[in-house]
């Protein structure tokens, strides 16, 4: 005769899982037990106005991350971002981290309201880890993309007040039929719509138009990792040249774009030594050419 397993209490403020729980989504569990901890609920909501007391839009009251680029290459995919955050017409920070590894085979970059976006991506990483612990297997890439879409959709109320978050997800799909198609890029809109980017490159944020224009000229799907990384940094340089909210390589302060590469071996942060060397080389070449793009 066996005794029933006791259940953990789930009273107010108790966020522990009960025995036998099959809830594999940490976000949904949090929504049911401690909704105030979700990124979209950590701000004060205004019922009728998006303007602050001084007449500023809500979106100008918090720092914003700007430009993120992603591109596939032979054997993998990479994600890179500039380091600047702006607040209205001011530079709020020069060294923000906007590119995050979310699990062994995926990474996400953020554009939009920095505070909410950073919390959302960190929660997404916990979501993926929680799912794998509960189910015993990792989510497929499509599953990851769908989970992130639902999290972005959950921020719609804040987005309607000007505090939008627009992530860019990349990953290596272990279930892909061809290794050449294993690197994948997924973009989102503010209401949680997800879009597979099949051109091999994409960009989000205020400088995305200029970054994509640059990538259109220099991108090659058959490039190796170093060539792809150079293309990403060069596109961010071009974006910073025309968009004041995007920060280019800052040689004076030693601030350079950050990047993550993902291959069959997993996700890896590109070292600052590598990005700084490429950035210095690009700046030197542009200086010799009189500031013109090649």
Curated annotation (Swiss-Prot):
Main location group: cytoplasm
Cell compartments where the protein resides: Cytoplasm
Catalytic activity: Cleavage of peptide bonds with very broad specificity
One BP term from GO: proteasomal protein catabolic process
GO MF annotation: an example: threonine-type endopeptidase activity
Pathway: Protein degradation; proteasomal Pup-dependent pathway
Free-text activity regulation comment from the record: The formation of the proteasomal ATPase ARC-20S proteasome complex, likely via the docking of the C-termini of ARC into the intersubunit pockets in the alpha-rings, may trigger opening of the gate for substrate entry. Interconversion between the open-gate and close-gate conformations leads to a dynamic regulation of the 20S proteasome proteolysis activity.
Root EC class: hydrolase
Pfam families xrefs: Proteasome
EC numbers, comma separated: 3.4.25.1
Entry's family note: Belongs to the peptidase T1B family.
Name of this protein: Proteasome subunit beta
Organism, scientific name: Rhodococcus opacus (strain B4)
Lineage: Bacteria, Bacillati, Actinomycetota, Actinomycetes, Mycobacteriales
């Amino acid at each position: 005769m066996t005794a029933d397993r006791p259940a953990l209490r789930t009273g107010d403020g108790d966020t522990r899982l009960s025995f036998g729980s099959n809830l594999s989504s940490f976000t949904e569990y949090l929504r049911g037990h401690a909704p105030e901890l979700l990124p979209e609920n950590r701000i004060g909501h205004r019922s009728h106005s998006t303007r602050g007391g001084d007449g500023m839009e809500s979106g100008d009251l918090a720092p914003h991350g700007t430009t993120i680029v992603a591109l596939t290459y032979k054997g993998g995919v990479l994600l890179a971002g500039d380091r600047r955050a702006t607040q209205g017409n001011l530079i709020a920070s020069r060294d923000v981290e906007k590119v995050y590894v979310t699990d062994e085979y995926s990474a996400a970059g953020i554009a939009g309201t920095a505070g909410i976006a950073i919390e959302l991506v960190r929660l997404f990483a916990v979501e993926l880890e929680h799912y794998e612990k509960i189910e015993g297997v990792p989510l497929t890439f499509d599953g990851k993309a769908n989970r992130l879409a639902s999290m972005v959709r959950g921020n719609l109320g804040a987005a309607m007040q000007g505090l939008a978050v627009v992530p860019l997800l990349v990953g290596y799909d272990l279930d892909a039929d061809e290794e050449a198609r294993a690197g994948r890029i997924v973009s989102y809109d503010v209401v949680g719509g997800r879009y597979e980017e099949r051109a091999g490159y994409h960009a989000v944020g205020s400088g995305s138009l200029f970054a994509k224009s640059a990538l259109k000229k220099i991108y090659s799907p058959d490039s190796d990792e170093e060539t792809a990384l150079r293309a990403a940094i060069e596109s961010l340089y071009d974006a910073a040249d025309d968009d004041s909210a995007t920060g280019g390589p800052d040689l004076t302060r030693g601030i350079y774009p950050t990047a993550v590469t993902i291959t069959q071996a997993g996700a890896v942060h590109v070292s600052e030594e590598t990005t700084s060397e490429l950035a210095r080389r690009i700046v030197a070449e542009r200086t010799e050419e009189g500031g013109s793009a090649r």
